[in-house]
A protein has these predicted regions:
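ATP/NTP-dependent adenylation/nucleotidyl-transfer catalytic domains that generate, transfer
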Residues: 1-18, 23-257
Length: 257
């Protein structure tokens, strides 16, 4: 990360700090690599952002000594929805409105990047990137992703290990159920199998090069396996547009090193 940021001519990095585990680990990595003076974290809350997410983000930013700002996105989202109201008339609310939130955050981070000469770090893990649990031109906007080849279950292990070296991530961030917080009471498990199951399937399919049938024969639920395999295959177009990052597995996506 430090080598790439320096060679690319950026003064430092900026990332969205959501109060979740992925951005928390990414922030810790950025500070370890660059020092707190070269890292900016931005909390961009909306209606669905939990109070504890705001508290945890602020606590971690203070813990690591980085520049921290809060930029609510309600005015941006409402402006977009007002512009789109006629076009969306007669349609039901769906992931379109959720993605607007993510894309508003991407716009803010890129504006900070342009103004301050900071590279935007994205924070999606390999489990999310594999199944497309990310928003194109939203939380995928950026120049580098330190954890793009790290499965979600590994993210937790890395976070716990990092805290054994020195406190860097609030314990509550590690213990809370993961959520994108783009809808009321949303949890990742609403859309995906539990990460223990998801990662086991992904490891078999991607790293193990196993067929869906072979994975099912290993004892996994057929519906889960076929859903995951379909998502992995369908979402290649998203992964092709993701920023580069560090490769840590034999089957990293893209041509990262």
């Amino acid at each position: 990360l430090r080598d790439y940021v320096n060679k690319s001519g950026f003064d430092g990095v900026v990332l969205g700090l959501s109060g979740g585990i992925d951005s928390a680990l990414s922030l810790a990595i950025a500070v370890d690599a660059l020092g707190p003076q070269r890292v900016q974290a931005v909390m961009m809350p909306y209606h669905y952002t939990a109070d504890i997410s705001k508290q945890d983000a602020a606590e971690q930013a203070k813990m690591l000594g980085v520049h921290y700002e809060i930029m609510p996105i309600e005015p941006m989202v409402e402006a977009f929805m007002g512009t789109l109201a006629e076009s969306f008339a007669g349609t039901e609310r769906d992931t379109t409105e959720e993605n607007l939130q993510s894309r508003c955050r991407g716009v803010l981070l890129m504006a900070i990047s342009n103004k301050k000469g900071l590279m935007v770090l994205t924070t999606g893990n390999k489990s999310e990137m594999a199944v497309g649990y990310a928003t194109l031109y939203g939380d995928m906007v950026g120049g580098f992703n330190a954890i793009k080849d790290v499965y979600k279950t590994w993210v937790y292990r890395l976070a716990r290990w990092r805290n054994t070296q020195s406190p860097a991530i609030p314990e509550r961030v590690i213990e809370r159920p993961p959520s994108a917080e783009l809808a009321p009471d949303q949890q990742d498990s609403d859309s995906l199998p539990d990460y223990d199951v998801l990662d086991a399937i992904l490891l078999s399919y991607i790293e193990g090069d196993m067929s869906a049938e072979a994975i099912i024969a290993g004892g996994f639920d057929a519906e889960d396996v076929y859903k995951v395999v379909k998502l992995v295959d369908r979402c290649e177009y998203k992964r092709r547009q993701a920023p580069i990052g560090v490769r840590v597995t034999p089957r990293g996506f893209g041509r990262d090193r």
